[in-house]
């Protein structure tokens, strides 16, 4: 439910972003009515690395958040999956724990447009 026209949009996908396409989205297409955005993303150029994207007002930052669990040695990963229910729940056979998960908060968000523009940043990659 939106109050005062402020709502949220959650973008969730498994495929990687192309870094150049995502950079173009952030630099040229990022909606002006987004107040805050935060979440995890990954790129075909660095498939083992998890990135944290944060935006507040005009400030935007993309920083390395370490490696995905999917990059762990198989025996360690198996133990981790047995212990961590959340990891097990979110696990994907192809992508492991890699995901695009961005939450946008803003006024009168065009959720469909945001998702379509971000979908244009996705690419196929063989892991």
Where would I find each of the regions flagged by the language model?
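P-loop NTP-binding site
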Residues: 1-127
């Amino acid at each position: 439910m939106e109050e005062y026209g402020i709502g949220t949009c959650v973008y969730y996908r498994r495929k990687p972003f192309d870094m150049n396409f995502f950079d173009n989205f952030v630099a040229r297409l990022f909606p002006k009515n987004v107040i805050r955005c935060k979440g995890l993303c990954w790129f075909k150029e660095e498939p083992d690395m998890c990135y944290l994207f944060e935006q507040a007002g005009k400030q935007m930052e993309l920083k390395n958040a370490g490696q995905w669990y999917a990059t762990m040695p198989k025996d360690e990963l198996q133990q981790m999956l047995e212990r961590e229910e959340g990891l097990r729940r979110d696990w994907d056979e192809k992508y492991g724990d890699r995901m695009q998960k961005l939450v946008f908060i803003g006024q009168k968000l065009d959720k469909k447009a945001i998702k379509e523009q971000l979908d244009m940043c996705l690419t196929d990659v063989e892991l």
